[in-house]
């Protein structure tokens, strides 16, 4: 027994020293990042949350405040207390500085104020009790007051925020409980073309399809809803699902089984998916379909890459985006510019890619900084990034969360992205 302890001690010391070295490197990188913020960003707002949040999404509304230099915009957040406290679905109100409408950028005075004083506030404006950690939360596009969540116990929940007070206490009382999964999950997506149509994916390897449009919700009753269809097509954890932005019957899913699958919800769910693509050599964590281009799709993987695909011929990869140093978990196209894609990783970075730059010639010096399509790398977090979200109302504004409770709202400098973007064809990526 004593020999085993002696043998294990050097290994433990090595791991401890490696962790100390890593934390030292992270702090040095953060210090360097902070020094360069005035040159790299038009806006940075940092806010410490009470508890970590695994999920973030901007709501679509924007409230202009007369006589001020800012607007009020809102974020959906959750809590991740790991059983140490009551969990909540949260709405945060964010003061965002006004853009100069003529140049679609922040005015210089507001940039300096935001960077120097942190004068724009972030406040939790609504807290709704939630059963367990909030793994994912998304609003219904047709009715933003309706929010779906994925919980840690396998159930999904529907909340009507108008049925809850600003700071609700007590037990969780969702408007509906969606029972269909036997394990927790993170896959959650509303159908943008079919109100009330919702897809979920979980660790039980199942995709569930739900219809909540026919339900009428009240503040006093929690309804139990069963799925209208279940897909047992993956052979491992389903990590993400996304409906096609233009076609209501098309649903994409990705899994630890390394496949990208395209489903047609009009077909028999007992049959094999119409398209099954072995997209990566390791687990696929996220999928995103371009909102402007019907055929352009991206996947993010544990192999540290993002892959681009053409839905007309998805069995041949268009291009690989390389720049992350660890597993890629987050993926979202810009809602404003067709060729702009962002990704996040356990390497504590959010990368912004410009597909128009694929194939551009580089000097050896530029090549050392990454591929030509790597437009920007946000390095403001010192812990693993949970999720990020593009702001729908302000071009080039992103909100991102890290496991250390830090929420950041940021916008790269116009010097970096300042040019008009044109449409990109999948043929140009080949």
From Swiss-Prot:
InterPro entries recorded: G-protein_beta_WD-40_rep, Histone-bd_RBBP4-like_N, WD40/YVTN_repeat-like_dom_sf, WD40_repeat_CS, WD40_repeat_dom_sf, WD40_rpt, WD_repeat_RBAP46/RBAP48/MSI1
Gene Ontology biological process terms in this record: CENP-A containing chromatin assembly; chromatin remodeling
Site entry (Important for interaction with HAT1), positions: 296
Location of Phosphoserine modifications: 425
Superkingdom of the organism of origin: Eukaryota
WD repeats: from-to residues: 129-169, 180-220, 233-273, 279-319, 323-363, 380-420
Localization (cell): Cytoplasm; Nucleus; Chromosome, Centromere; Chromosome, Centromere, Kinetochore
A cellular component annotation (GO) from this entry: nucleus
Keyword hit for Nucleus: yes
Coiled-coil blocks: none
Pfam families: Beta-prop_EIPR1, CAF1C_H4-bd, WD40
Assembly: Component of the HAT-B complex composed of at least hat1 and hat2. The HAT-B complex binds to histone H4 tail. Component of the CENP-A recruiting complex composed of at least mis16, mis19, mis19 and mis20.
Function in brief: Regulatory subunit of the histone acetylase B (HAT-B) complex. The complex acetylates 'Lys-12' of histone H4 which is required for telomeric silencing. Component of the CENP-A recruiting complex that ensures the integrity of mitotic spindles through maintenance of kinetochore factors mis6/CENP-I and cnp1/CENP-A. Maintains the deacetylated state of histones specifically in the central core of the centromeres.
Protein name in UniProt: Histone acetyltransferase type B subunit 2
UniProt organism field: Schizosaccharomyces pombe (strain 972 / ATCC 24843) (Fission yeast)
